[in-house]
Amino acid sequence: MDESSRIASSSALHGLDEMVSAHKPSPPLPSRRKGKSALRSALEKKNRKSKSKPKVTITSDTPKVSSQHSPVSSAYTGDSTTDLDSKSGHSSSQKLSNKVSSALKLTIPKRWRSSKSSSSQCSSPFLPTSSSNGHGDDASLNLPDKKSRPSSQSSIFLSNWSTIFSSNASPTDSQLSPTHTSTIAELAASTLSIFPSGSYAGSTFGSPSRSSIDSSTYLPRSKSVNSLSSNFSARTPASNQSSVSEDFGAAPNCDHKHNSVTLSDFALPDIDQHDTVETILEKVEFTIPKQFTPAILSQGTSSLLKLCLRKYLSVVNFKCISLDMALRKFLAVYVLPNETQQIDRVLSTFSDQYFHCNPDLYDSSDECYILTFSLMILHTDFFNIHNRQKMTRAEFISNTNLPTILPEILECFYDNITYTPFVHVEHIGCVVTSPSNEKPSLSQRLGDSQFRLTKRNTFATESDHQALQEQLTGFRINLDSILDLKKIDSVRTSIESPTRTADDLYKEFARAPFLQIVSHRSQPQAFSYHFEPSAESESTNPAIINVKVFKLGILIQNEKVRKDRLLSNREVGVILTSSQLMFFKNVYWISGLLDQLEDFKRSHSFSPCYFSPHLTSLSADYIIPLSDLVAYGDGSRIENELYSFSVKQKNQRTHVFSVTNVDELNDWLVKINFVSTFATAGLAPRERLPCVESSDKSIKASVSVLPDIYEDSDAMSKASKETRSEVLECSKVRVYIVQNRIYKLEEALRQGESKMTVQRRNAANILHLEPIQSRTRIRLARCSNTLKKNMLAQMIEIQKFKISIKFLKEDLEMDSHLQDYLRSVFPSSVMGKENASEDTILESNFRNHSNPSVRRSNLRVGKTVESVQNTKLKSVENDSGKAETETVGKNPEVVRKSPAKLPNIANIMTVNGHRYSVVELPDDFLRE
């Protein structure tokens, strides 16, 4: 402390001591000298200790003062008359001292108190003077010592007193008047003028926040039960308040109670018949405040005002905001009308604008409207103090009744709405910042009801739209890593583009190698597609069964031994046949077969490849059926430079395999899915027909697979007329089966894509949600994990349906070419009847079809299809009297005349003593 400050402090304390002593009877001189010396020693000790905090004492004798001189004092001390008893006077003064001390936030040590009076000639206009009778009450402020008080306030307080008592101070005329009487309340009020004070204007909900100035400055709150600062600050001069308002950046006149306006103060301007949407909006924006504009525009029922309301709200940006937070943002700026119909118009327009900004979150604007209205009803129900039975979470989900939205999303809406009420921000000149970024004061941490730590309203006083936008999106959690939509979209059943066609795959299957199995207990024709035992066909020769191998190789299987361990990789041999995947742990045997196949390819031989030696049995370690099987992958490379793909069974069990290059990966995917498509439909991939002139005792002619004897193109022309006609009818049956399967797959694909669209909307909704409570975030994280699994399974099914439809349509196109081929082989005289009925197509009402498994069994054993035919014609018997032509299904190009009979396929497979499957092809049909 410098010399000037020391002199000022000494003079201030000296004057204070003289003023105090002027109101007390003079005690003996030794005691008076002792008090002065103690005061001086205390001041010198204070100056020597620079780290100690300066403290001030106030000791005065309060006379009997009329209430008209001190209204504040009379308000807090009760009656203006005081008791002459020293105890009662000291008690009343003690109560007043405690109240004043809480307002001043100061402490006074005992050693600075003095009960000695000095000469009555020493008086000050700033302290109360004695009455005419010379007696008064002792009003010493006996306060506890607080060592934790900041030194900045004490320094300011001390410097202010030094200024008051310095010779340079210029008191007012009223203060210099000898008849002016000051009280302790007035002294406290004049002392509090050094602290900043200001009025607030903010929200209708919540508590006022502190200003964004230095947090060390004390700002008294209004209506505080802990201090009297709000009452004393009211006596601060207007000039002082104006300066404080300027320091806080607020307007001088920002009293919310005096400047508030309501919706009833405004009305819809007059509208002429020549007014347009633009002119009406100009009138409304010129005469009506922004927060009341939607409510005013909703008062009219004309379509023109609805367009005005829609255009006015079209500038509001709701992109990437959840619906509940968008509703908060909307109600923070705009005021809803009072009538129900008008509220309905405003909320309907809000829903349209929200759906326009976020078309991927909901199915339609009507869905947004239902949710918005449900949220408003929930808010009204929950925060209504007269409603004892609050709406529960389960009741809210049940009342909303939107099955396409996940319950976890509705639960998040419920938690956010019930956590804190909606807030409307008044648009006035006061600039108030949010308290969320400031450290709470001591009174806030001690449990002030206006500043709760557990449920603090962060939307209460936010008037800046940009900051409000940041607050509304500050609770969003990152669920992208859990959902991982990119991985879901990368699921493919074929890596190459474009995928190989069915014609290309048929050519590869026609040249596929064979495994030969020798059986001594079976007849040669036992493994034919349609076998009827006869005495003539019995033979003692062993039967050789040819098993076509569509694909074989060595794969790395990835499997988990235990849940807590990493993947274990092991090599397995895999053989793909027409009906199953066969796995062998003996990879050396598979490696030998691969070597034989490579040698055969280098020989450029046109005959089929037969693996040697012949097998007495074919026992795989485990088998996976191809029915309802799908193979998929994403083409991504995993560790050790491998490409992985998965095979998913009908029972949802998944097997993961790895290959060394992407070409091998794509080859496995395409061939597995191709064979699985026909195995699921109850068909087999087409093969070449055996020679019709071969002997029945030929081993290779006894099986339905491709032998090493090629078909002669002239063989068909030698067949009888009835046989040729039956072959064409057989082809029609296959067309019917394939068409039926395509129709069912397309229906399943539409349903799967619809479910996938709903799941994508739910995923986007979860990513945009902003849960406030931690328990809501935990539920959303669990829901995201479950949703990811469902979306992945649905995407796999969609890809399976797509590739199956592709292969079946290509096979259907091949059937039409096959019929043309057969007609070209048969003589024209034989095909005359067929040509006459060429315009008659097979009736295909796919919805009323018989059991597929029963139908497949009937076709394979050669039974008649009368039951199938009756089932097919049952739905069209009632329509026989209708028009000749009608549209089939949803395709207007497919027209049928009279219901055509299904072909009778009994015994139609016999051609020169040979029985063939409906899935076989002539040899020269597959072009080289």
Curated annotation (Swiss-Prot):
Domain called SEC7: residue spans: 228-420
Magnesium in keyword set: no
Compositional bias segments (type: Low complexity): 89-102, 115-132
Entry's Gene Ontology BP terms: exocytosis; intracellular protein transport; regulation of ARF protein signal transduction
Keywords: Cytoplasm, Guanine-nucleotide releasing factor, Phosphoprotein
Entry keyword Phosphoprotein: yes
Main subcellular location of this protein, as a coarse class: cytoplasm
Region listing for Disordered, in residue ranges: 1-152, 227-249
Modification Phosphoserine occurs at: S67
Cystine residue pairs: none
Cellular location(s): Cytoplasm; Cell tip
Gene3D superfamilies, alphabetized: Arf Nucleotide-binding Site Opener,domain 2, Pleckstrin-homology domain (PH domain)/Phosphotyrosine-binding domain (PTB)
Domain PH as annotated: residue spans: 548-677
Compositional bias of kind Polar residues: 1-12, 57-83, 234-245
Domain of life: Eukaryota
Listed GO CC annotations: cell division site; cell tip; cytosol
Pfam families: PH, Sec7
Coiled coil: none
Record-level Gene Ontology MF annotations: guanyl-nucleotide exchange factor activity; lipid binding
Entry function: Guanine nucleotide exchange factor for Arf GTPases, stimulating the nucleotide exchange from the GDP-bound to the GTP-bound form. Involved in vesicular transport.
Domain remark text: The SEC7 domain is sufficient for nucleotide exchange activity.
Name of the protein this chain belongs to: Arf guanine nucleotide exchange factor sec74
